[in-house]
């Protein structure tokens, strides 16, 4: 459960992230594909090379969804309901991949905003990413 402090921390860090959505999203995806090669199986039609327009485009969508969830932090489930349906019923993405991408996204934020990612903000962002992952996998059951 996200506390009031967590919600403020998440909104604050996303204030710094939002203008870099495409770059940070692409960087997180590239990290995930390299670190966890099995995640590439969901993107057989993508050019997964560094700087690929497809990876950048999908990265922008990923971070846009995270920004939307942060903007509606009291209703993450409602905000991401359609995305949850898509990933559970059509794309059938293995639920563990949301956690892997979340970890990669945390690394990207740490690289680009080291002073902003205090231990408290890190913990809040991790809780938020776990909450998003839980919402995206809720319809698998």
Curated annotation (Swiss-Prot):
InterPro entries, sorted: Globin, Globin-like_sf, Globin/Proto, Hemoglobin_a-typ, Hemoglobin_oxygen_transport, Hemoglobin_pi
Family listed: Belongs to the globin family.
Protein role: Involved in oxygen transport from the lung to the various peripheral tissues.
Keyword Heme: yes
Organism field: Francolinus pondicerianus
Domain of life: Eukaryota
PANTHER family, per database record: HEMOGLOBIN FAMILY MEMBER (PTHR11442), HEMOGLOBIN SUBUNIT ALPHA (PTHR11442:SF48)
Pfam families for the chain: Globin
Quaternary assembly: Heterotetramer of two alpha chains and two beta chains.
GO molecular function list: haptoglobin binding; heme binding; iron ion binding; organic acid binding; oxygen binding; oxygen carrier activity; peroxidase activity
Every Globin domain range: 1-141
CDD domains for the chain: Hb-alpha-like
One of the GO BP terms on file: hydrogen peroxide catabolic process
Gene expressing this chain: HBAA
Tissues in which the protein is found: Red blood cells.
Annotated binding of heme b, by residue: 87
UniProt binding sites for O2: 58
One Gene Ontology cellular component annotation held by this UniProt entry: haptoglobin-hemoglobin complex
Identification of the protein by name: Hemoglobin subunit alpha-A
Key words of the record: Heme, Iron, Metal-binding, Oxygen transport, Transport
């Amino acid at each position: 459960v996200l506390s009031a402090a967590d919600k403020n921390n998440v909104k604050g860090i996303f204030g710094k992230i939002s203008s870099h959505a495409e770059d940070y999203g692409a960087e997180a995806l590239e990290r995930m594909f390299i670190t966890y090669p099995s995640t590439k199986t969901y993107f057989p039609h993508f050019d997964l090379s560094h700087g690929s327009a497809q990876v950048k485009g999908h990265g922008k969508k990923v971070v846009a969804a995270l920004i939307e969830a942060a903007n509606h932090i009291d209703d993450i489930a409602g905000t991401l309901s359609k995305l949850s349906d898509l990933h559970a019923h059509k794309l059938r993405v293995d639920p563990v991949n949301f956690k892997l991408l979340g970890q990669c996204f945390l690394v990207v934020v740490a690289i680009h905003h080291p002073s902003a990612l205090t231990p408290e903000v890190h913990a809040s962002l991790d809780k938020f990413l776990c909450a998003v992952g839980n919402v995206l996998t809720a319809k698998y059951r």
